[in-house]
């Protein structure tokens, strides 16, 4: 699958507008975020599910009271069931309908670059932390993708950089592990998330990086 340096591919979901572009190098700054498109030893693409949804986290950060929630109905479909129950418990008026009990906040594994570490050292550290030390890195791919995500709900733009990461563990190895990380609740195969809004662009990212090893 070819993907030139000048080519930009755009995906849109109900919540996001995502630009994917191949670049030569990852810039180093205090705000650089890097992510790993992890592939198991038996060839499965991995994805993380956040413990808390971005929507619920944003609501909590904007509250001035412990007892009152002010929530846009547009956010409700992007929250976990237990988060919706907490909102419902605090409602003074209105109701919550059309709850999706199967919602998951899918994310690529990775995080913010520390100024004293290399890109690969950052990814090794993040994967170790987010998997509770269950994931170890075999090798990294050579292709780098720049991901520019426009969040239509919060009117914010996020930039991250992604590369393939081939790990030593199989999907079976990871399926029997429990994760207690504060951010990640589960690591699973992207193939199990075909009905998720993010599946199309995430699978595109993996296909580009895997086929460019």
From Swiss-Prot:
Gene3D superfamilies: Nucleoside Triphosphate Pyrophosphohydrolase. The keyword Hydrolase applies. Its cofactor is Mg(2+); Mn(2+). Mg(2+) binds at residues 126, 130, 183. It comes from the Viruses. N(7)-methyl-GTP binds at residues 16, 50, 151. InterPro entries: NUDIX_hydrolase-like_dom_sf, NUDIX_hydrolase_dom, Viral_VD9. It holds the Pfam family NUDIX. GO terms for molecular function: hydrolase activity; metal ion binding. Residues 30-209 form the Nudix hydrolase domain. A motif (Nudix box) lies at residues 111-132. It catalyses: a 5'-end (N(7)-methyl 5'-triphosphoguanosine)-guanosine in mRNA + H2O = a 5'-end phospho-guanosine in mRNA + N(7)-methyl-GDP + 2 H(+). Keywords: Hydrolase, Magnesium, Manganese, Metal-binding. Acts with RNA polymerase to initiate transcription from late gene promoters. Belongs to the Nudix hydrolase family. Interacts with the late transcription elongation factor VLTF-4/OPG110. Interacts with the late transcription factors VLTF-1. This is mRNA-decapping protein OPG121.
